[in-house]
């Protein structure tokens, strides 16, 4: 890939090749909020992939920004065409990250951030080089509190996600980095430092 990105963390305009970063977490750990913070601070350097899903949009979600909301038939057609680098069927819903979506971001000369579930993250890393980051709540009790505070999901959905979180947390050791989101600002600074370290490794070999 010939397109390079100017490091947002460098004062001297250091350039490096754009890279794929995968961020995963149990529902309620804060991965979406932390990713949005990174994009707001560095809009020219980072861009999130837009995953496809068959679930309905939640209040405030925008098609083409948060997700590509598609029918189950359309999703299965994409599967038949082998459009996805990774896909999962979770909680009765299909989710997938397409090859075209990752290429779209990287070819713009931006670091690509894929915010996906743990199963998809580990599958995607087998397909192409990536830095994997796991966001974790400080405790299971805090994760449950955050999930219960959500108004966008029904009680049985929250229960399903909480039960599934144990499986996801058990896979944290398979990731390159683990960030504990106890305090949002502190967690963001840790996440930011990971990107600085990875850019330094890319820039200086």
From Swiss-Prot:
It comes from the Bacteria. It catalyses: GMP + ATP = GDP + ADP. The lineage of its organism: Bacteria, Pseudomonadati, Chlamydiota, Chlamydiia, Chlamydiales. SMART domains: GuKc. Keywords: ATP-binding, Cytoplasm, Kinase, Nucleotide-binding, Transferase. It is an enzyme of class 2 (transferase). Essential for recycling GMP and indirectly, cGMP. PANTHER family: GUANYLATE KINASE, GUANYLATE KINASE-RELATED. This is Guanylate kinase. ATP binds at residues 25-32. GO terms for cellular component: cytosol. Residues 18-196 form the Guanylate kinase-like domain. Gene3D superfamilies: Guanylate Kinase phosphate binding domain, P-loop containing nucleotide triphosphate hydrolases. Its EC number is 2.7.4.8. It is found in: Cytoplasm. One of its GO terms (molecular function) is guanylate kinase activity. InterPro entries: GK/Ca_channel_bsu, Guanylate_kin-like_dom, Guanylate_kinase, Guanylate_kinase_CS, P-loop_NTPase. It comes from Chlamydia trachomatis serovar D (strain ATCC VR-885 / DSM 19411 / UW-3/Cx). Belongs to the guanylate kinase family.
